[in-house]
Amino acid sequence: MKKNLLHILSLLLVMLTGATLTAKADSYKVAPMTAGKVTVSPNDEFVNAPINITNYGTNPVKQITYTLYDFDTQESSEPQTIDFETPFDNMQQVMIPIKPGKSLGKSDVIFNVTEVDGHPNETSITYTYIERWTVLQAAKKRVVFEDVTGLWCQYCPRGIAIMESLERLYPDDFIGISIHDGDALATNAYSSMLSSTWSNTNRPLIMCARDEKVNTHDGQSNFKYELDKTASFDISVKATYDGKDINVTSSVLPCLDVEEGTEYDVAYVLTADGLKNDNWGQANRVGEWNDQVLPEYDRFKGNESTLYGLEFNQVAIDSKGVQYGVDGSLTRPYTVGTMQTHKVTFENISQHKLIQDKSKLNVCALIIKKVTNGDKIKATIENAAKCRVDVGETGIKQIGNNETNTVTGYYSLDGQRLNTPAKGITIVRYADGSTRKVRN
């Protein structure tokens, strides 16, 4: 009896000790990741700075408390609390409101996570610097996806669906360029990159800002991450067809100071929408897309291994300085607030037999950021703009009585197809492939 009692007491002691050790093992550690630049106008109340925070503690985080230290005013804010509806185990993005500085220019703000779930933050580095720029004009950020594709590629419908869905959902923020390789829609527009940077890659190769590969089926995470970045330059572009050539003018406004040793130039890509041919058959991986919810995948569902009658948009036709930008198109010093303009010409447009309707031509102007490391140059897309080529009366395809630009569909902001326009904002898609946001 005494032995049994001692055994039970020993077990209780072990259990209590284990519980005590478990309680002591709880840790509360949240570390903010490096934050990028944010731009804010003196007239803005604040702008939201996206910051990723990582949970290194033992439990899912329900709440954090933080302070902001403003180097401009040399003052710390009152503690602010963020509650998370869904506690997070690993990484979470938070939006931190940043007020404009007292004067134009750069001034840092320190974001410091002081508490985690009501406990002092135990991580070694609890803060990060936010690089705030107070500017008269902030750059309008647009994200460029380049999709290397081919009719022969059975997995390439993924790129088609991603590119067209992002253009439908974010017509003001997204620019897509479709680069065909080894098929009837192939051109020389990207030959320099297809023979070098992208020569030994699988298809489709979908690049976001030439910085990250897109490996998902909707491209949303890449797009939103890039859109949150602050661009150092604002850019606009216009293009006019004179009956023979397309004359292009880009206007670039430096909005932020840039790092020494980083160079910028402008590249230009001529693209075409609405390309169709009854002989063009797109290879299709049967069954690959059946679980996808974006409506752009619907045409690829079913049992057709080759699809005919598709309309191809955003197709690269010609380019100028596509890999590194046109040399000298932007010149140092990149003085904040001082506009730089540049002109190029796409000559003899009639040589491009792939073009079917000159009223569906676009010019994309890409600001190429170049960082040299030894004998290698890393080139990414800092920002971009796109315009429809103004053809006047010269290149417009005549529309017959049965070819009006009719509405072909209504969509909600999250991509769901609607039978009729919804109350609020509806995305309207037209027969020519264009989209427009309409408020009802």
Where do the PLM segments sit?
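Bacterial Sec-dependent N-terminal signal peptides
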Residues: 1-28
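Intrinsically disordered, low-complexity Pro/Gly/Ser/Thr-rich segments with frequent PxxP/GP/PP motifs
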Residues: 74-102
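Short, conserved sequence motifs used for protein processing/export or organelle targeting and
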Residues: 175-392
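C-terminal outer-membrane/trafficking sorting elements
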Residues: 394-440
